[in-house]
């Protein structure tokens, strides 16, 4: 089962009386974001006790206070992942997909911003992997290669499910 971290956070914001477009969550007070992030991690952890999960999340979020880790240490400890799988594409393709996605509100869709986002995602993933003692895998999701990317992801998840991490 796949659970989207941002969707769980959005549900929690709504329960607090803050109905927000998902791109407005990152504009909230950083302390509030941090608390809701931890609550979301706890909710997802409870879900994971029932069945294996893939948590779809961002490694970082651009907030009004700067870059914020998508999985800060407390969140990482709650989630206790077995692996980190980064799904990447070429910066030009990411920028194109962002421009075509009319459901989202992004400040910029330039390829150079996508390049920076890929770099920051790897930095954050590296930090998480060191803290949690888990591997990082990268799946390329380039234009026309979605089926291959899905199969690569499936193979990694199947292999990860058979490995017992400390």
List each model region and its residues.
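NTP-dependent small-molecule kinase module
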Residues: 122-166
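A short acidic, glycine-rich active-site loop
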Residues: 28-35, 108-119
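ATP-dependent NMP and nucleoside kinases share a basic, alpha-helical "lid"
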Residues: 57-102
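Class I S-adenosyl-L-methionine
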Residues: 14, 95, 99, 126-133
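A solvent-exposed, charged loop/short amphipathic helix patch at secondary-structure junctions
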Residues: 95-115
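ATP-dependent small-molecule kinase phosphotransfer cores
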Residues: 7-69
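Post-Walker A helix-loop "phosphate-sensing" segment adjacent to the P-loop in P-loop NTPases
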Residues: 1-2
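Short, hinge-like loop/turn segments at secondary-structure boundaries
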Residues: 19-23, 102-104, 155-156
């Amino acid at each position: 089962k796949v659970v989207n971290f941002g969707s769980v956070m959005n549900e929690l914001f709504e329960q607090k009386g803050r109905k927000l477009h998902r791109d407005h969550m990152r504009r909230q007070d950083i302390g509030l974001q941090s608390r809701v992030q931890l609550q979301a991690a706890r909710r997802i952890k409870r879900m994971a006790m029932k069945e294996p999960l893939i948590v779809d999340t961002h490694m970082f979020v651009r907030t009004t206070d700067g870059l914020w880790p998508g999985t800060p240490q407390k969140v990482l400890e709650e989630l206790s992942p077995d692996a980190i799988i980064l799904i990447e594409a070429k910066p030009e393709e990411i920028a194109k997909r962002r421009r075509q996605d009319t459901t989202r509100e992004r400040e910029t869709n330039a390829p150079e911003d996508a390049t920076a986002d890929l770099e920051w995602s790897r930095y954050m993933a590296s930090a998480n992997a060191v803290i949690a003692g888990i591997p990082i895998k990268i799946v390329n999701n380039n234009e026309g290669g979605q089926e291959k990317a899905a199969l690569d992801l499936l193979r990694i998840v199947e292999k990860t499910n058979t490995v017992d991490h400390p």
